Regions:
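A short beta-strand element within beta-rich, extracytoplasmic domains
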Residues: 148-162
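Terminal, low-complexity interaction segments
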Residues: 177-257
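N-terminal secretory signal peptides and thylakoid transit peptides that target proteins
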Residues: 1-16
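Extended extracellular/luminal ectodomain segments enriched in beta-structured repeat modules
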Residues: 144-152, 221-224
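Short beta-strands within extracellular/lumenal beta-sheet-rich domains
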Residues: 129-145, 160-169, 209-216
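Short coil-to-beta strand junction motifs in C2/discoidin
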Residues: 89, 162-172, 241-246
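N-terminal targeting leaders for non-cytosolic proteins
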Residues: 36-133, 172-194
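C-terminal region of N-terminal signal peptides and the immediate post-cleavage residues
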Residues: 20-42
């Protein structure tokens, strides 16, 4: 999160969902009167075109056509006792909004998760108890209307700034996944509860840069997953608004039969 983060995100205006790919019907009638084989289709959910933010804690998206649509609901599942959505000054609340810029070195705008501590005296460190870290976190849940396969996306802007924030991200799902940083990224960890994705060092990175990205790929069909965003920078400065934000890139996945 670089200094330009504030005032650069806007809520996505609602429009009819963009058809990212035509979806094959699970069972179509073949020319000989039999049942045609279902063919999975690769789809792309673009936040700027397919998503509607209904509040700072909820939104929804849909891709597909009139015959078959994949819907996604995004909801805040929980928030810690020392965490609020938006910034500390309460002048901006950009949680679950779509960025006004392309994120993480991609060509697409991203979905923001934006939060801040309520009290600086209750901030957590990486060595704090699990309970204290939970107070300084927010969990967002993603639910698809039906299982999708080969789901993949980036989490961008996982960075840190002294006396401000230190990003950590935990992913949980019944489906197995991998989460890792690529060449040139400073992100460490694998996204699990014991090894969260996290800033590899204290360095604020511009939101448009790919140097703080992690790639998440699900290895089996998935219906839902959750993402817990934590702050483990215990220090603070009264002159610094301690808000933090990460972004999700567009989602790519394949329909299932």
């Amino acid at each position: 999160m670089a200094t330009e983060r504030r005032a650069v995100i806007k809520g996505a205006a609602w429009s009819l969902p963009v058809i990212a790919a035509a979806v094959a019907a699970p069972a179509a009638v073949a020319s000989d009167g039999g049942t045609a084989e279902c063919v999975p289709v690769r789809m792309h959910l673009d936040w700027a075109g397919d998503y509607r933010r209904t509040s700072a804690t909820a939104g929804s998206a849909a891709v597909g056509d009139a015959e078959s649509t994949i819907a996604l609901t995004v909801t805040q599942a929980s928030i810690g006792a020392n965490t609020r959505t938006g910034n500390q000054a309460r002048t901006e609340n950009l949680n679950l909004a779509v960025s006004s810029f392309a994120v993480g070195g991609t060509a697409s705008r991203g979905l923001a998760i934006h939060q801040s501590p309520i009290s600086n005296s209750r901030k957590a460190a990486s060595t704090s108890s699990a309970a204290r870290i939970a107070e300084n976190s927010q969990t967002i849940r993603f639910d698809f209307s039906e299982p999708v396969d080969q789901l993949s996306f980036l989490i961008t802007d996982i960075d840190a700034a002294a006396y401000d924030y230190f990003d950590r991200v935990v992913i949980e799902s019944a489906a197995p996944f991998t989460a890792s940083s690529g060449s040139g990224s400073m992100v460490a960890g694998s996204g699990t509860t014991t090894d969260p994705l996290r800033a590899g060092r204290i360095e604020p990175v511009p939101e448009t840069s790919g140097r703080a990205n992690a790639t998440v790929t699900f290895l089996e069909p998935v219906t839902s997953f959750s993402l817990t965003y934590q702050n483990v920078e215990s220090r603070s400065n009264s002159r610094i608004d301690g808000d933090q934000a990460i972004f999700l890139s567009a989602l790519s996945f394949t329909t299932t039969c």
